[in-house]
Amino acid sequence: MLLVVIFSVNAQVPQGFNYQATVRTSSGDLVMNQNVYFKFNILQGSQTAVPGYVEIHYVPTDDLGQVTLVIGQGSASTGVFAEIDWSLGSYYLGIEIDTNTGNGYIAMGTTQF
């Protein structure tokens, strides 16, 4: 008896990445029950590369100053999340925040992921 098994494997593009943060003022006070802007920059190859994908989220903090969102499901201003080719090497995530208008972002850091 000959048994032939064929597997079909489809690579799936991630729909996004969960992100959670606690928002504080520069003096360390919690930013509670207030809408804040987050800007996420995805850079390929180095921390100083030009972002290939940028998105913005406008989300409320809760009673503890926390936000929860999905990177990849915000308002894209550069690029298309689903078109990122994750096999092309290292990627970095830059995070910026603005607790006021969406025009005065403060860089919170960039990390490889």
What are these regions (language model features)?
Residues 1-3, 9-113:
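Family-positioned intrinsically disordered, low-complexity linker/tail segments enriched in G/S/T/P
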